[in-house]
């Protein structure tokens, strides 16, 4: 629904925030999700520099989704990336799973961030460049998410599933 505002009930997850290195929004988003799960299950979260080295592609000047999936799998996670819907976001957060999303703000490259909450007509993201639990108007989020193909990624530790 182009231009439709997202309408949600209240959900929020306490996901650690990680500041991105240059061109490292993907690495920082992966680190946030790994650190979130490391608080709940005995799973190792590698250092940000190691994650960035494994993910960053010099040829694309960014982080290919295929590398994100492979890194999660290598570190003991089941990871799934797909074109999502508003209901998918809410369902995953309700199940206690932070969601990595790709957004494409007008005039800029796609940017990874971690969806941490939804309250009424706002979503909250841990943005690797801007900070923790940044409120974003639901309509703006929908436009930016749609511009990036509504891409979302869920990663769950193997022993949690």
PLM feature spans:
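Conserved active-site-adjacent core of cysteine acyl-enzyme catalytic domains
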Residues: 10-16, 34-36, 46-160
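Structural helix-adjacent loops and short alpha-helical linkers that scaffold large soluble proteins
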Residues: 40-44
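Hydrophobic alpha-helical targeting segments used for export or membrane insertion
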Residues: 2-11
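Short, aromatic-enriched amphipathic alpha-helices that serve as compact interaction elements
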Residues: 29-33
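Active-site-proximal loop/helix segment associated with metal-binding centers of metalloenzymes
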Residues: 25
